[in-house]
Amino acid sequence: MIRSRMLALLVVLAAQMVALPALSRDGPADASAALCIKAAKEASRETGVPFDVLVALTLTETGRTRNGQLEPWPWALNEGGKSNWFADRDQALTYLSDAVAAGTSNIDVGCFQLNYRWHGAAFADLQAMMDPKANAIYAARLMRRLAGDSEDWLLAAGAYHSSTPDVAARYLARFDPIYAALGGGQVT
């Protein structure tokens, strides 16, 4: 029931979407952006979560268009719905450290936008949470757990963002076209 509702919403929303910027499985030319792709590849090897699923996830979470290409960004933070893309790791860590010291816990971190409130305790410190490889491996393990034995990556991607069906469906309306543009077709 939930799956059929999500798929119906995806069809409607996908029909309304404008063309996506160019995407590349090989990753962006920018060295920082390439860190998320490299981390996704390593996490895929370690966990068995399909590489294209992880690339689509990082692009959905942190993707921004630069030079006509959608690229992920490892130094991205989202605090209470406000996205910030910092130029480098040090700037992002300074902002993150200050926000956490001020009592903010609803902040999404790094390539896969792991929420500090829900996942921060899994990391030794904020630097580890921001690290592209550690961020990717944690996200991939979470996706593996959410997909379960069914390996339903569509449902896992929706649940990765939210367990609320309508919120997950809106997220999937962005995720699925990105995945398809990578050459993966629709996730099943």
Tell me the role of every PLM-derived stretch.
Residues 1-10:
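Bacterial N-terminal signal peptides that target proteins for export
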Residues 23-188:
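Catalytic glycan-binding domains that act on GlcNAc-containing polysaccharides
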